[in-house]
Amino acid sequence: GDIAVRINLASAGLWWLGFSFLTWTRLRQRHATHPLPAGETYASAGFKQLGKTFREMKNFPETLKYLLAYFLYNDGIQTVIAVSSTFAAAPLIRGGIGLEQDTLIAVVLMIQFVAFFGALFWGRLAKWIGAKQSIIVSLFIWAGVVIYAYGGLKGDNRVAEFFILGVFIAIVMGGSQAISRSLFAQMIPKGKEAEFYSFYEVSERGTSWTGPLIFGLANQIFGSLRYGILSLIFYFIAGLIVLPFVNVKKAMDDVKEHS
């Protein structure tokens, strides 16, 4: 009921407060290596540095290719995560599953727990077959998730099926994103990690609206959330098309050449 929701929200707040307190008390303050130029603000200096990083990217074509693949499939991942609760709670007549709030909360909590072990699994898999191949495997699973969400979850067993689907989401959710970041780290120059990761984050946020837009348009056109979910397979297919063409070894060689 309402008390369970209140406890859930309070526990999340205490979690963030606890780790924020550790940051405030334990993290050593470091002063800027370079002082802010005269007449500049932190905002203007940041945008100039972002532009400089963008111009430098021409020296790393494989990294750019990887970023394109990442932006595509990550938009799909983020949108699935964002709309899954809406899809699960919506009534069957709208193409949803019709889950009760208590059941939905239980699935969400289960996903957070299983995702931890999923991240460990993908870390081991990446050591075995490589980071890029691990991401490709995860994208096939993500594609399978949206296909099953579209075609399944309709009968009397839909609650149990959604729990099982949640396990698959949890397994690939943390792992695919963590491996993506670690692979990007191998494709950028040493000593410029902050610059390139800033570009990585800004570019990611700049395209994050496309997934919800596609989902919403498909839902409006076809009148069912299931078509909205199915439309997200575009991002995973696009990622699967681009990612195999990324030459990780050449990207690392480019980094050595321009470091």
State the predicted function of each range:
Residues 117-131, 219:
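Helix-to-loop junctions at the C-terminal end of transmembrane segments
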Residues 140-156:
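C-terminal ends and interior cores of transmembrane alpha-helices
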